[in-house]
């Protein structure tokens, strides 16, 4: 039922009998009690939208009001001149900070809910003032002049950015600083307003502003602590004021330094990793490249030595890239320390090479150590070849082109090694040793063939991601002999082998071949001494024989020779201490 229809049904000239002191008058209300609320407008104000519009068309205008006259206080019988006033959501009128409760969402609607689309906060039923969450103030001992709806009305704001303040007057003929509904402010969100006399004295008064009201100053709310901090009166400078300014800026500076410190170290770390790895020669900076040329010109006895020399030149480059930053300097020094340890026992660094050297061995036979090495099958001669490797190549015809992979009789097994050190020594001494269970299986296979066909072993290092070669089993297992050359002393037994292929073949070349005797898993996902059926073994041997490799363990043969010498010296020292 619209307000315009109610105007035609109600007579004029009857006063309101309902007071604001008590709201428990459900049964005693008459239709004449609401005459002041719905009477025709004596002084219409065309600046506001008519109340008959259910959905306010000017919802997003800077300010929205209702066309009630000032002489007829709509919901108050105390003669107050409050008028309903609503503001648009988040509207700033005169550039003032919007720190006061907004009238659009700060007042309760029907049954205490939020008004819908800017509708006024009165209840839908005129007799339902007792449902107002803020209207029942009979127990507060306040004046009876204010009604349950007094907190829902506000005077037109002047310079508070569309916020609502009770008791404000926007017209010159109205009394300033008059807030009749202050008894309900303590109970609602509308009470959030400036309550400090010092703030009121420091802020200039504006017509219609209730900042300087004495009745409002008693209502201090904790949430209004921010505005006084920003508009506090000037005080003489003291050490506390001076210290407070750096205190606000200092965390930001520390945060920036922290961010800069955390973002700057990665480039030098990556730069040093490029220098220290076996694969990359370090073409990033000029200083490492010069050191690399010097290392190539020196006589090479082992691969770790150039790495250590090259790593010692890396910290100045890292420091130069960082500049005057002092925080990123500590990370680079441990790297030369680690590489110096690797110069003595380069086990950690060496095991990085098999996995990543595919990108570092495309430089005309020069590996990541900066030492000229011959790639297997490439035909190039090393600048400083190792004598042991040259002797092995002269005796054995590695990677033959006329290999007969189409076997009529024979057996093939997968061999998984713990490290490339053992692969190096197997090639060097032409022997191998498996686990106790593996030795029995290989020995039985060799004896079952009885010379009718070969027993091939497909070697792969755990975690390397490639097969490193193929060897043929040449003798039965001797269980009573310990070779004593392996990187670990737990292996017992020995049998002779002859290496045929020494090349790195990635698992991606062989992953499509699956073994029906191993749950149909790829041949690359096999355990030690896993037998490969003959038909599948032919496919594997064909791929390995025809694969054009770029890397092999021969590229790091000098490195493993040095490692073996170091291990043997350590064993001799232990034996000398034991005696």
Curated annotation (Swiss-Prot):
Looking up Pfam families in the UniProt record yields:
YTH
UniProt modification remark: Ubiquitinated by the SCF(SKP2) complex, leading to its degradation.
Q: Which one of the record's GO molecular function terms can you name?
A: N6-methyladenosine-containing RNA reader activity
Q: Which residues carry this modification: Phosphoserine?
A: 2, 4-5, 22, 39, 196, 359, 394
Compositional bias (Low complexity) at which positions?
Answer: 337-349
Feature: compositional bias, Polar residues: 291-316, 372-383
Specify the domain of life of the species encoding this protein.
Answer: Eukaryota
Subunit details: Interacts with CNOT1; interaction is direct and promotes recruitment of the CCR4-NOT complex. Interacts with YTHDF3. Interacts with RIDA/HRSP12; interaction leads to recruitment of the ribonuclease P/MRP complex.
Instruction: Please explain the role this protein plays, according to its UniProt record.
Output: Specifically recognizes and binds N6-methyladenosine (m6A)-containing RNAs, and regulates their stability. M6A is a modification present at internal sites of mRNAs and some non-coding RNAs and plays a role in mRNA stability and processing. Acts as a regulator of mRNA stability by promoting degradation of m6A-containing mRNAs via interaction with the CCR4-NOT and ribonuclease P/MRP complexes, depending on the context. The YTHDF paralogs (YTHDF1, YTHDF2 and YTHDF3) share m6A-containing mRNAs targets and act redundantly to mediate mRNA degradation and cellular differentiation.
Q: What protein name does the entry list?
A: YTH domain-containing family protein 2
Please tell me the species this chain comes from: Mus musculus (Mouse)
